[in-house]
């Protein structure tokens, strides 16, 4: 019997796939558990239209992520932090600090999408990666300045 998986099932496939399984397995386990539905002509057509709609949504998200990446690349970010006389910071500049600076510029990004190669503990210029979409990653440059010092 052919079924359409509603959820990811180990050793069978991912949600949305059409797979062939034995009748007993489908009728006694997959369908009652809500893991699959019978693959009829109507459900297959509905699956195809749903896949097309999701592809359109993903393309729109990808396009907006690319536009946002272009905006972020143009930004000159400055992070203010408390520092000693030698230029060493009291603490570190984290992804949350960069997310806060981006938010002040009008771009709201979750701090978990920002990665830095190493902790920033001194004044200077640095780069971080921002993952906006599965295949859209932008490098953002930022400068760490001592708090209260105007450039």
From Swiss-Prot:
Listed InterPro entries: Ribosomal_bL9, Ribosomal_bL9/RNase_H1_N, Ribosomal_bL9_bac/chp, Ribosomal_bL9_C, Ribosomal_bL9_C_sf, Ribosomal_bL9_N, Ribosomal_bL9_N_sf
Gene3D superfamilies: Ribosomal protein L9, C-terminal domain, Ribosomal protein L9, N-terminal domain
GO terms (BP aspect): translation
GO molecular function ontology, one term from the record: structural constituent of ribosome
Keywords: Ribonucleoprotein, Ribosomal protein, RNA-binding, rRNA-binding
Disulfide bonds: none
One GO location term (cellular component): ribonucleoprotein complex
Superkingdom of origin: Bacteria
Function: Binds to the 23S rRNA.
Record-stated family: Belongs to the bacterial ribosomal protein bL9 family.
Name recorded for this polypeptide: Large ribosomal subunit protein bL9
Lineage, uppermost ranks: Bacteria, Pseudomonadati, Chlorobiota, Chlorobiia, Chlorobiales
Gene field: rplI
